[in-house]
Amino acid sequence: MRIGVIAIQGNVEEHVEAMKRALGGKGEVVTIKHSGIVPTCDAIVIPGGESTTLCRLAWREGIAQEIIEKARQGMPIWGTCAGLILLASRGDEEVTKTKQQLFGLMDITVNRNAFGRQIDSFEAPLAIAGFDEPFNAVFIRAPAIVSAGQNVKVLAKYDDFIVAARQQNLLVSAFHPELTDDLRFHWYFLEMVPGWKN
């Protein structure tokens, strides 16, 4: 199993390390900084970061186009925080103002700074669909999903905002599972991979 982590900007190292732990030696994790690597992977993680910069670089490097193509073929893609924004079909005024070209893969509308700025970062226990125990979620300038289509399964909510969801092979979380020692969200994503092999 080969998991690619988009490494053009953002919270990359933590994701790589957490994914390696989650794989337990039964696969490899590669970082992606340019086009040509996405098609060689079995699944992709789009980490947090500054969404405007991440979006611009992904399109410029040809990575966005590759992700869209592979996602439409069924490759599992997981977007955390800024990655959630990129996978969305619709954004709020903030997204429109910055002229972000979203990937348009998930039938969701996103509020880019739903939980405020960096100083408003916080942790909260979340009830996540399919998890026996609450998941301690770390939110950093987090976005949120304000509406979702019928094909989108809501996995978690916080303050009436959707903060984790899945649409077939696409998974998003507004929080950062890689910043905790809890690997359940990583395992959840990895369970999506065997059904689709590159």
UniProtKB/Swiss-Prot annotation:
Pathway: Cofactor biosynthesis; pyridoxal 5'-phosphate biosynthesis. It catalyses: aldehydo-D-ribose 5-phosphate + D-glyceraldehyde 3-phosphate + L-glutamine = pyridoxal 5'-phosphate + L-glutamate + phosphate + 3 H2O + H(+); L-glutamine + H2O = L-glutamate + NH4(+). It comes from the Archaea. Its EC number is 4.3.3.6, 3.5.1.2. Keywords: Glutamine amidotransferase, Hydrolase, Lyase, Pyridoxal phosphate. The active site is at 81 (nucleophile), 176 (charge relay system), 178 (charge relay system). GO terms for molecular function: glutaminase activity; pyridoxal 5'-phosphate synthase (glutamine hydrolysing) activity. InterPro entries: Class_I_gatase-like, PdxT/SNO, PdxT/SNO_CS. GO terms for cellular component: cytosol; glutaminase complex. GO terms for biological process: glutamine catabolic process; pyridoxal phosphate biosynthetic process; pyridoxine metabolic process. L-glutamine binds at residues 49-51, 112, 140-141. Belongs to the glutaminase PdxT/SNO family. In the presence of PdxS, forms a dodecamer of heterodimers. Only shows activity in the heterodimer. Catalyzes the hydrolysis of glutamine to glutamate and ammonia as part of the biosynthesis of pyridoxal 5'-phosphate. The resulting ammonia molecule is channeled to the active site of PdxS. PANTHER family: PYRIDOXAL 5'-PHOSPHATE SYNTHASE SUBUNIT SNO (PTHR31559), PYRIDOXAL 5'-PHOSPHATE SYNTHASE SUBUNIT SNO1-RELATED (PTHR31559:SF0). This is Pyridoxal 5'-phosphate synthase subunit PdxT. It comes from Methanocella arvoryzae (strain DSM 22066 / NBRC 105507 / MRE50).
